[in-house]
Amino acid sequence: MAMTELLNAEDIKKAIGAFAAAESFDHKKFFQMVGLKKKSTEDVKKVFHILDKDKSGFIEEEELGFILKGFSPDARDLSVKETKTLMAAGDKDGDGKIGADEFSTLVSES
């Protein structure tokens, strides 16, 4: 499934552009801009599974660094600092990875 089957391509493009500068990523604003915040829990979990590149059932820190590329292949990677900030916000149980339920919570808190 492509991300554009769940989210509007123009919204994705605008959101990626808004956070093109290094160290500018704000997951709350990003999730709102791409329209993820308005989606059902089921659709948010579909987005999670697209972002879970290795299909482990979790988004690990390495995958998290490439989260923007999951929305648009030409997007930038997150910096180490941005990645760690996002992991800290999303990893509710402290196991070093974000599960589908944790991702849904992260989006709903945006």
Curated annotation (Swiss-Prot):
Binding site for Ca(2+) 2: D91, D93, D95, K97, E102
N-acetylalanine modifications at: A2
Superkingdom assignment: Eukaryota
Alphabetical list of SMART domains matching this protein: EFh
Binding site residues for Ca(2+) 1: D52, D54, S56, F58, E60, E63
GO cellular component: cytoplasm
Example GO molecular function: calcium ion binding
Family: Belongs to the parvalbumin family.
PANTHER family: PARVALBUMIN ALPHA (PTHR11653:SF2)
Domain notes: AB domain, comprising of helices A and B, is involved in structural stabilization, protecting the hydrophobic core of the protein. It is required for high-affinity binding of Ca(2+) and for Mg(2+)-binding.
Name of the protein in question: Parvalbumin alpha
Species for this entry: Oryctolagus cuniculus (Rabbit)
